[in-house]
Amino acid sequence: MAKAYWIGRVEVNNEEGYKPYAAANPAIFKKFNAKFVVRGGKHECPEGQSRSRNVVIEFPDYATAVACYRSPEYQANLKIRQANAITDLIIVEGYDGPQPQDFVAL
């Protein structure tokens, strides 16, 4: 079964107001067996508009990723984030099929 990911691009406009959101997330993510794959870090934006923070959060599967986002706990916490940051967030299903390097040229 393919894993799933939240991919977020974040521009925090109120650091102090954002802190309670960040502090509440570990308990929520633990409940849904999520883990950070990317959490900030150095980045380059060769195309499109950049934001100052980028995150990728991994979930066991797509249904779990959606359930976490829709959970009452996250929805309550989301209001804090929305008041203190501009965010683009997508939920995507991963791919666990064959890779190009797995094919043998004939």
Label each PLM-derived region with a short phrase.
Residues 1-53, 60-70, 93-106:
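Short S/T/G/P-rich N-terminal loop/turn motif that feeds into the first structured element of a domain
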